[in-house]
Amino acid sequence: MAIQKRVLVAMSGGVDSSVTAALLQQQGYDIVGVTMQIWDPEVTVVGDDYVGCCSLTAVDDARRVANVLGIPYYVLNFRELFTEKVIQYFVDEYFQGRTPNPCIACNRFIKFEALLQRARQMGFDYIATGHYARLGYSEEFQRYTVKKALDDKKDQSYVLYGFTQDQIAHTLMPLADYTKDQVRGIAKEMGLPTYSKPESQEICFVHDNNYRNFLDERSQGGIKPGPFKDLAGNVLGEHKGIPFYTIGQRRGLGLATGERTYVIDIDPDNNVVTVGSEEAIWGTELIASENNFILFENLTGPQELEAQVRYNSKPSPAIIEPYGEGLVKVTFKYPQRAITPGQAVVYYQGDYLVGGGTIEKTIKQKN
């Protein structure tokens, strides 16, 4: 008789991770549920209505699901590591005039590194999450791979480009071939109490998505206002502080220029936010750092692929090529709107996730 494979399921208290646990249990795995405590509940739980993935409500919901499934359930403390790798990164990036993606940092350092390491120490064969992406092994590439989920609307491959081969080999994502409606239907049919729970659109550690207050509380010496300038260097008004702006932003500038005005550059060294017309926020080339590749070990020459510059956009034809030590130059066939330093650029070959990196700068803009 084959020995049951043991799986540690990351349960956020939402419907996706609930159904992940249920499906794997049905498939015969030996399941244990776990919620990662990544933020101080005394700070996070501002009101009874807060249901973020690290709230006490989320822990209660995950425990209720575990009880329905009859599986063991634990809460593991990752608060110190999360503060260092995600929260401090989030704060530092904004104060450097960049726009961070904390979900990618969390996946890279917490879920698929620290949790997998802990799972191995506890004797588990795999970890599992409620992400929508297809993991597997390709004979063609002779590598473990990540592909887009069946449901384009829910595909989360963009935030998974940091995967290593070892991590893919020891991670299960059983929702890859389901739609969200189907997942809710499974949860309802199985009597899981999270079947109708709404999706959280917030940054999990920022209550009410009010990141301005969050940053203000963590600023050293306070957030300083400074000048809005146009491309000619003329002062147009006063901004409220570098961390409150992102490339392509139009709302909330408080400028009366007589035309639609957008943030086109942020200079943290001189505390200047440059604004201009929409035309100035389109670019065709960028430089990316901290690149990771999944389909191959290293990028050795130019490749024609598709690249995506933000989570909710679509991949667009591009050429990626090495650009100095550790950097990649991405040249798009068509101009991209508001290429934003700090965000991820992710590379695709059809449905395959090739890899990705962090946008450092745009090096050419549309004229």
Curated annotation (Swiss-Prot):
SUPFAM superfamilies: Adenine nucleotide alpha hydrolases-like. The keyword Cell membrane does not apply. Residues 154-156, 310-311 are annotated as: Interaction with tRNA. Disulfide bonds join C106-C204. The active site is at C106 (nucleophile), C204 (cysteine persulfide intermediate). One of its GO terms (molecular function) is ATP binding. The record marks H131, Q343 as: Interaction with tRNA. Pfam families: tRNA_Me_trans, tRNA_Me_trans_C, tRNA_Me_trans_M. Keywords: ATP-binding, Cytoplasm, Disulfide bond, Nucleotide-binding, RNA-binding, Transferase, tRNA processing, tRNA-binding. It catalyses: S-sulfanyl-L-cysteinyl-[protein] + uridine(34) in tRNA + AH2 + ATP = 2-thiouridine(34) in tRNA + L-cysteinyl-[protein] + A + AMP + diphosphate + H(+). Its EC number is 2.8.1.13. It is an enzyme of class 2 (transferase). One of its GO terms (cellular component) is cytoplasm. It is found in: Cytoplasm. Catalyzes the 2-thiolation of uridine at the wobble position (U34) of tRNA, leading to the formation of s(2)U34. Belongs to the MnmA/TRMU family. This is tRNA-specific 2-thiouridylase MnmA. It comes from Desulforamulus reducens (strain ATCC BAA-1160 / DSM 100696 / MI-1). The gene is mnmA.
